[in-house]
């Protein structure tokens, strides 16, 4: 079912592309609306609504299936088919060259179904959507001699007058896509349509704009204003000698690096005190052999 819906969506987009290439005139739209009103009042009576367009009133020179149809299943209406056009145009649409006016069984009426497969009642708009079932999945709809292959249009919600809001700045749609690609293909156009609609209305925008600060410049990074704590740190050295362990403890300035070995480090900042409370009670501070770097330690 998803594949069939994708096929109908594609056919609809192709028809919209043809309409955007050469839009229908206002006179033809008024006639279609009048015919639709008559059909809605008398659903059992079939009325022919297609007429030959005058030169310049409509740019569609090839037939395009009308989206207006009776729920009783009438003949498909062809708009813009002149007296000189034959059934070759039907082959362009993917329809076999036969009498289109007599192929009433080629129309298929779609309803809305729930997850259990039952038809949902009370929805009137879905009953009037008539789709030509004889269209091939790879067929294209022509929109004139100078049709645009890479153009597309989104139809928005109809206004109170019955006319649809169109978006002529949409991105092109790929010719062949699967059912899983419908959401991806239409995502950019939906966002563009929402952006245009939100810009055109007078209602305040909901939410707030997210302002992302720029990344920090490493060249302008400032040092911390908090000074490094000055003082001494206590270091411990364990030496194994056979079955004995010698433990040595001493202090080094806080600003010096921690290294291996019994090393008496020197203050690099010039602010660390010479002795602390622990240094004063250290009896071996004067008799201990100090090394100021690793190469001085004998192996």
UniProtKB/Swiss-Prot annotation:
Entry's localization field: Host cytoplasm
**Gene Ontology terms for molecular function:** metal ion binding
Can you name the source organism? Measles virus (strain Edmonston) (MeV)
- Annotated Zn(2+) 1 binding lies at 232, 251, 276, 279
What protein name does the entry list? Non-structural protein V
Gene that encodes the chain: P/V
Q: Where is this region: Interaction with host STAT1?
A: 110-120
User: InterPro entries, per this entry?
Assistant: Paramyx_V_Zn-bd (IPR024279), Paramyxo_P/V_N (IPR028243)
Q: Where is the composition biased (Acidic residues)?
A: 146-160
The record's subunit annotation is: Interacts with host IFIH1/MDA5 and DHX58/LGP2; these interactions are involved in the inhibition of the host type I interferon signaling pathway. Interacts with host TYK2; this interaction inhibits the type I interferon signaling pathway without affecting the type II pathway. Interacts with host IRF7; this interaction inhibits IRF7 translocation to the nucleus. Interacts with host CHUK. Interacts with host RELA/p65; this interaction inhibits the nuclear translocation of NF-KappaB.
Read off the lineage from the record: Viruses, Riboviria, Orthornavirae, Negarnaviricota, Haploviricotina
Naming one, the record's GO cellular component terms include: host cell cytoplasm
Question: Which GO terms of type biological process are on file?
Answer: symbiont-mediated suppression of host cytoplasmic pattern recognition receptor signaling pathway via inhibition of IRF7 activity; symbiont-mediated suppression of host cytoplasmic pattern recognition receptor signaling pathway via inhibition of MDA-5 activity; symbiont-mediated suppression of host cytoplasmic pattern recognition receptor signaling pathway via inhibition of RIG-I activity; symbiont-mediated suppression of host JAK-STAT cascade via inhibition of host TYK2 activity; symbiont-mediated suppression of host JAK-STAT cascade via inhibition of STAT1 activity; symbiont-mediated suppression of host JAK-STAT cascade via inhibition of STAT2 activity; symbiont-mediated suppression of host type I interferon-mediated signaling pathway
Mark out the compositionally biased spans (Low complexity): 134-145
